[in-house]
Swiss-Prot record:
Name of the protein: Maturase K
Domain of life where this protein originates: Eukaryota
A single GO molecular function term of this UniProt record: RNA binding
Taxonomic lineage of the native organism: Eukaryota, Viridiplantae, Streptophyta, Embryophyta, Tracheophyta
Keyword entries, A-Z: Chloroplast, mRNA processing, Plastid, RNA-binding, tRNA processing
Organism annotation: Trifolium wormskioldii (Cows clover)
A GO CC term assigned to this protein in UniProt: chloroplast
Functional note: Usually encoded in the trnK tRNA gene intron. Probably assists in splicing its own and other chloroplast group II introns.
Gene Ontology BP, a term: tRNA processing
């Protein structure tokens, strides 16, 4: 990274065309090759007969410039006619190279912005998924309306490339990137489909994630820009990392849409208590005041996507609901605001009064049905939640089988320990425990009853229920009251950076 930093500092004096030469640096493709296959570029790979060299990549790029895109067919063979090598393999390597090169300036600017804001030490904790829920507990109990928003896709990558050109001044690099997308990914269709997006994301995951995250970052920066301009209140939790020179031209059309109908109304309706939370492709928008303001932001989003990103979005896809009557799903939890009513007797002189107190509490619970559906998909139970054996693991040793089930149980317990109600989590543990017992009984060709009688049911698999208590006892005092209280309350962990699929935990 020091070499990249020195190179970019020299290139900034020219202010353009500083990424294009990196495409022809061999260590870039060495990083891409190691990222995909976890092997060195010079190590022989039997599947490709060691035909991968930088010379072949340069030849492929040259052919991309010379190719007539009018005769490209969607049913082209995977074999490249002018090289005779596997086309998918080279497209994946070049895609990784593009992703690595285009990430460099954004990563360096992001790092410098974090250093200036002096939040490097707390940045890891902020990245945790669970850091969102203390924010929800603190803010959402004072809000009244919530809106679930699904970020629309697919978006044509040509639009993203055009926007990228205004962030990084390097015309040859983005011209080559556009040729690559049209040549290998069949992006010559006018309207991309979800199937083509899915195919591209699987064959070029790193480049797809970068382009998608850039799309989300671009729309969020515009949204926060509009919010700051509308309310004249600067957000302390957000800072613009990059220059804005393309947005101001596009914003004129966006402002015209609202200036006709709301020019005399909007200044009297300002809502500083609007809160926005996003994870992956879903975001939550919550507000305290009247639904009119939520409708205003609803149409802000719709016109932003349609006018700026050319993505069609229907108004009926964004629903506005009351928090007290609607539960929203975020990060694998179901959340809603519950009203707690209590009556207090108050006495003043000779008179006695009954005062009703209403308090709000954010309930965050485990979604039992989606979890059982995931367990059924991974063959731990049937669709009704009845545990079944997993014969695929029967060839492993008893220790490995128990360790695999414990790892899944540990991850689920670690992630869903913030639930208000632990009954659903205990049911998931029970399913995994019986599935483990049935798998061991299947391996030893015995019934569950006979296997438990022979091995001892009390000693077997006791880690499913004791391990979490042992971990808590290392953190908190070992008295029973404290442990019981922490079993009942929520515990959020600041070391969870992503949620694993059950199938990937094998």
């Amino acid at each position: 990274m020091k070499e990249y930093r020195v190179y970019l500092e020299r290139a900034r004096s020219r202010q353009q065309d500083f990424l294009y030469p990196l495409i022809f640096r061999e260590y870039i493709y060495g990083l891409a090759y190691s990222h995909n296959f976890n092997r060195s570029i010079f190590v022989e790979n039997g599947g490709y007969d060691n035909k991968y060299t930088l010379l072949n990549v340069k030849r492929l790029i040259t052919r991309m410039y010379q190719q007539n895109h009018l005769i490209i067919s969607a049913n082209d063979s995977n074999k490249n006619p002018f090289l005779g090598y596997n086309k998918n393999f080279y497209s994946q390597i070049i895609s990784e190279g593009f992703a690595i090169v285009v990430e460099i300036p954004f990563f360096l600017q992001l790092s410098s912005s974090l250093e200036e804001a002096e939040i490097i030490k707390s940045y890891k904790n902020v990245r945790s998924i669970h850091s969102v829920f203390p924010f929800l507990e603190d803010k959402f109990t004072y809000l009244n309306y919530v809106s679930d928003i699904r970020i629309p896709y697919p978006i044509h990558l040509e639009i993203l490339v055009q926007i990228l050109r205004y962030w990084v001044k390097d015309v040859p690099f983005f011209h080559l990137l556009r040729l690559f997308l049209y040549h290998f990914c069949n992006w010559n269709c006018f309207i991309p489909t979800k199937k083509s997006i899915s195919t591209f994301s699987k064959s070029n995951p790193r480049l797809f994630l970068f382009l998608y995250n850039f799309y989300v970052c671009e729309y969020e920066s515009i949204f926060l820009f509009l919010r700051n301009k509308s309310y004249h209140l600067r957000l302390k939790s957000f800072s613009v990392f990059f220059e804005r020179n393309f947005f101001y031209a596009k914003r004129e059309h966006l402002v015209e849409v609202f200036s006709k109908d709301f020019s005399y109304t909007l200044p009297f309706f300002k809502d500083p208590n609007i809160h926005y939370v996003r994870y992956q492709g879903k975001c939550i928008l919550a507000s305290k005041n009247v639904p009119f303001l939520m409708n205003k932001w609803k149409y802000y989003f719709i016109h932003l996507w349609q006018c700026f990103f050319d993505v069609w979005s229907q108004p009926r896809t964004i629903n506005i609901n009351q928090l007290s009557e609607h539960s929203f799903q975020l990060l694998g939890y179901f959340s809603n605001v519950r009203l707690n009513r209590s009556v207090v007797r108050s006495q003043m002189l000779q008179n006695t009064f009954l005062i009703e107190i209403v308090s709000k509490k954010l309930d965050i619970i485990v979604p039992i049905i989606p979890l059982i559906r995931s367990l059924a998909k991974a063959k731990f139970c049937n669709v009704l939640g009845h545990p079944i054996s997993k014969p695929v693991w029967a060839d492993s040793s008893d220790f490995d089988i128990i360790e695999r089930f414990l790892r899944i149980c540990r991850n689920l317990s670690h992630y869903y320990n913030g639930s208000s109600k632990k009954k659903s989590l205990y049911r998931i543990k029970y399913i995994l425990r019986l599935s483990c017992i049935k798998t061991l009984a299947c391996k030893h060709k015995s019934t569950v009853r006979a296997f438990l009688k022979r091995s001892g049911s009390e000693e077997l698999l006791e880690e499913f229920f004791t391990e979490e208590e042992e971990i808590l006892s290392l953190i908190f005092p070992r008295d029973s009251f404290t442990l019981h209280r922490f079993h009942r309350n929520r515990i959020w962990y600041l070391d969870i950076l992503f949620s694993n699929d059950l199938v990937n935990d094998e």
